Amino acid sequence: GCPQTPRCTNYAEKGQCPPN
């Protein structure tokens, strides 16, 4: 689960976070 943080909202960084 990717935490709802401003960093994870970035597409590039979000791609490195697990889905959800």
UniProtKB/Swiss-Prot annotation:
Subcellular location as annotated: Secreted
Any one Gene Ontology cellular component term annotated for this protein: extracellular region
GO biological process, alphabetically ordered: defense response to bacterium
Keyword Secreted: yes
UniProt KW keywords: Antibiotic, Antimicrobial, Secreted
Predominant place of localization: secreted
Function: Displays antimicrobial activity against the Gram-negative bacterium A.hydrophila.
Name listed for the protein in its UniProt record: Antimicrobial peptide AJN-10
Originating organism: Anguilla japonica
